[in-house]
Every structure is written in C-alpha cells, then in structure tokens.
Amino acid sequence: KVPGNQKKGAEPKVVEFVDVYPTLCEAVGLPVPHHTEGESMMKLMTGEDKSWKDCAIIKWHSGVTYFDRDYGYTQWNDKAGNFQGHMLFLYRNDHLETKNVADAPENKEIVAQLQKEILARRGKDFMKQVPKADKPERKGTQAHKRK
C-alpha cells in the first residue's frame, strides 16, 4: 500500500524488480533519474494505467527468459549463439514451474512464437555481457591489513 492511495486490491499484471525504484521515487515525490530502466507502477496501482506491459524479458548469464501471465520460456545459447537448451512452463496448469514441457510436440508452435517474441522485444545490446566493475578495497578488510 502506498500512502494516499485509496485503491485496494491486486492487479494481475507483469511487473519487474526494476519497476520498484521508479515507483518509490514517484511515491515520495522525487524525480525519477533518467538512467532508470524500470517504469513507475503508481498509475497502475491507482487504476489510471490500463496499458501496462504484458510481458518481461530477462537475461541471466547465457539464458534469456520471456514470461507473461500464461507462459514462462527460457532458452540458453552458448557464446557463439548456438542453441543449448530450453524450458517452457504453462502457468495456467503449472504456476510453480514443476514440469518442463518445451519439447512436447503439442507445444512446438508456442515455443516458436515465444522465441520470436524474445527476438522482437529485446534491445540491440541485450546479449552483451556487462563488464565486472573493479571493487574498491574497503578499509578494515584483510586485504587492507596485508599492505
């Protein structure tokens, strides 16, 4: 619940963790920084926004996941882009993701469609690896004491 928001209930929408920060900024009256990736959920929570996103695409190491209210689909590729494996969960029957049905013949068209969705919706730099930042040494650590 957000202070000043009288609307109660839940919205069956896809939200992402990156949406939390801009939402908190807007809720307390701070400007949302321009580099923020997410979208504020304030209009969604107050019922003003009916055009909220219908899916999310997530990258984790070599895996790319598409999910919406109906499906969760993950595909893994090697560094050269070659297919390594995949999994599909049908949320209407398996919301806990216990049965991978990606290779079931009856889901072939669903898998093909979700693969197209991933390609169509991801950004051009989506598959680039983010370089690891050098961590500054903190005073008081063992590394600091060894110098």
List the model feature ranges, each with a label.
Residues V101-N107:
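Active-site-proximal N-terminal segment of extracellular/periplasmic enzymes that hydrolyze or transfer
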Residues Q6, K13, V18-R92, L96, ...:
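C-terminal cap/loop subdomain of S1 sulfatases and analogous C-terminal strand-loop tails that border
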Residues I110-L114:
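Short amphipathic alpha-helical coupling segments at ligand-binding clamshell hinges
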Residues K7-A10, A104:
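Active-site oxyanion-binding pockets that recognize sulfate/phosphate
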